[in-house]
Amino acid sequence: MTQPRLVIVESDILIRHPLAEYLRECGYQVFEATDADEARSIVEGENDIDVVLADADAPNAGGFALATWLRREHPKIKVVLAGNVAVAAEKAGDLCEEGPNLSKPYDHQLVLNYVRRLLASRGPSR
């Protein structure tokens, strides 16, 4: 079985990097992106990305535009939008598997459990 591959989209390195390191320690291959444009480049350049975890307020195109693009161009990739913007809840619910269940600051264990649930829901691994 190959390592699940995740992209974390977060402009703040003090948030992004510790979460990425934690998920790596838990057995995931993690790519880090500072904005939606960088995340798109990673998704286009890498094979078999499983999950994209993006800040709803990501710079450039933003997390919602990224999620919309992923749904259209890469429908097999699971999308998680995170943030603390209550107004965005309805829109996030339309773009994510289960709505906006992650808030910031991230609880690393909650993120890990959420990612595991998403990956388990897609069926057998590649």
Task: Locate each region found by the language model.
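Conserved acidic carboxylate
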Residues: E10
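C-terminal output helix
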Residues: Y106-L119, G123-P124
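Acidic, metal-coordinating helix/loop segments flanking the phosphotransfer/catalytic sites
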Residues: E32-V51
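Conserved phosphotransfer microenvironments
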Residues: A54-R71, A86
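Residue-level signal for the "D+5" position in two-component response regulator receiver
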Residues: E32, A58-A61, P105
